Amino acid sequence: MVRGERMLCPAWLLALAVLCAAGSEVRAQCMEDARCRDLTTDENILDCIQLCRSDLTDETPVYPGESHLQPPSELEQTEVLVPLSPAALAPAEQMDPESSPQHEHKRSYSMEHFRWGKPVGRKRRPIKVYTNGVEEESTETLPAEMRRELATNEIDYPQEEGALNQQDKKDGSYKMSHFRWSSPPASKRYGGFMKSWDERSQKPLLTLFKNVINKEHQKKDQ
């Protein structure tokens, strides 16, 4: 029996500590009482627990209605605030840097199908065609079809064998003999309106004179 009473003492002490930890004001009132100062006997412990419990019920207001509509107690509020550590409240810039490259990689991959994303292939550079000696160096880079086109163009439009003399350049104007309209025949210039008197046919004038003479003779006869 004595052993059972000794085992009950730690349990009562633990319950008393929980009640005292519920509020600072309740703890102060409990410690001021003489029964709570002398905890050697079980009667004093039970009386102290009842005193602290009554003080705790007096301090906490009782709300009418269902229990789920009542405001949370201080213990529940502390339990809710403990999981919110400073690391969870830290801004996104102070997060682990290893997670940011993955986000950037996903973003770049998702932006590939837009116009400003990654290019699909290399841009084609314009092919430079040289008409002088540099062409021999660039023939290796040109495809076979381009070389054939250049060869046919050279055959169709051959260059003049000799350059113009310096005297011809000084004296006369430059003749564009390599163009189709450079030197048309005189009969086709300006649509044939600028023909000379000798080149034009004189038959219309002769018929005109004959008609005038015949009319004058007819008037005289009348």
From Swiss-Prot:
Propeptide stretches are 29-105
Q: Which domain of life is it from?
A: Eukaryota
GO terms, biological process: neuropeptide signaling pathway
- Main subcellular localization, coarse class? secreted
Signal in keyword set? yes
Q: Provide any one GO MF term from the record.
A: neuropeptide hormone activity
Question: GO terms for CC?
Answer: extracellular region
Q: Which UniProt keywords apply?
A: Cleavage on pair of basic residues, Endorphin, Hormone, Secreted, Signal
Q: How is it modified after translation?
A: Specific enzymatic cleavages at paired basic residues yield the different active peptides.
Localisation: Secreted
Signal sequence: where? 1-28
InterPro entries, A to Z: Mcrtin_ACTH_cent, Melanocortin_N, Opioid_neuropept, PMOC, POMC-derived_peptides
Any Pfam family from its record, for instance, is: Op_neuropeptide
Entry's SMART domains? Answer: ACTH_domain (SM01363), NPP (SM01364), Op_neuropeptide (SM01365)
> Would you identify the family this protein belongs to, as annotated?
Belongs to the POMC family.
Protein name as it appears in the record:
Pro-opiomelanocortin-1
Per the UniProt entry, what species is this protein from, by scientific name? Cyprinus carpio (Common carp)
